[in-house]
Amino acid sequence: MKKILFTVLFLGGLVSLRAEEVPDSLSVQKKVTIEEVVVTGTRNETDVRHLPMTVSVVNREQIEHRNDPSLLPLLTEYIPGLFTTSRGLMGYGVSGGAAGGMSLRGIGGVPQEGLPTTGMLVLIDGHPQYMGLMGHPISDAYQSLLAERVEVLRGPASVLYGSNAMGGVINIVTRKMQQDGIRTHANVGYGSYNTLQSEVTNRIRKGRFTSIVSGSYNRTDGHRKDMEFEQYGGYAKLGYDFSSSWKLWGDVNVTHFNASNPGTIQVPLIDNDSRITRGMTSLALENHYEKTSGALSLFYNWGRHKINDGYKTGEQPQTSHFNSKDKMLGISWYQSATFFTGNRLTVGFDYQHFGGESWNKVLATGERKPGVDKQMDEFAGY
């Protein structure tokens, strides 16, 4: 976060009977800028000035001023070259008629309704966050209550993060509590089309122990018939500092949303509804010394999707609904050291397992017709 320190030089003197013209003291100012420290594009915390790529940072103050339950509208406003598609007052949905497509500098996703983003990677605390079966991010899962700040690497990052980062990388850094004490924040808003957004967060730090618990509920009827959206979710994070150099933390986030797609005005749809549940959890042990730093982390993401593709006026309702389950888990270890000025050596290992299964459930009989069932493993050392 950029901090701006102002030093005002005040020129004064003893009171005198003779008036004397002096310059305006407030016009003499000095501004000092403290650069941001980021973790995107490198494993360890690094001054953004020392990175060979372009990284933009959105801080917590900017997130709170925007007062939006989703991070994407905020990022579209603050990040140059980032574009996202939208379709209504709240929510993006999935499958046909979905929005939330992302692109950076024209690369990432196809700006067409219903087509997923495949060239933009979203991370939470450095862990990949996308559907394990389809391989695309779920835009409604990236909520403002999670984020302490958001770091956006603009431009190709496939060497660091894989082929699904051709457009860039969005890294959501989760909330922290730096000072001792208890902080509770609540926010409720109500507006047009029966739109409600609410959030409550409690943060505690007592000595070496920290905790964060957040919950939210958001809904809207939408500006068209059959365009309702409802979402509720929760986030919890616990941490413990063993010393000034070693810390352990773990977190869990679960969100569920119901989204309806009315189709186009020319060709409306009936009962095109989706019921989506997404979850993620992670555990990390970190060390920070003057000359070296590193971490061992584990993460697990999962999802459950139920989708009714709906039908057009004059057609028959769907006789079966699409269902899917997906997961993604991984282990990451790295250690970075500096031996002399301008040098840094990092060694590490990453393992990821992802995949899932899909099926169509016949409504009349409950029969399950299998679709895709795929699992994959990836590992690499560096």
Write out the residue ranges for each language-model feature.
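Short strand-turn segments of transmembrane beta-barrel domains in outer membranes
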Residues: V169, T174-I204, S214-G215, T220-K225
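Extracytoplasmic beta-strand/coil segments of soluble accessory domains associated
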Residues: T76-H127
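Short acidic/polar hinge/loop motifs at secondary-structure boundaries
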Residues: G119-M120, G126-R154
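Outer-membrane beta-barrel channels and translocator barrels
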Residues: Q179, K206-F209, S243-S245, T255, ...
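Outer-membrane beta-barrel transmembrane domain signature of Gram-negative proteins
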Residues: T319-Y382
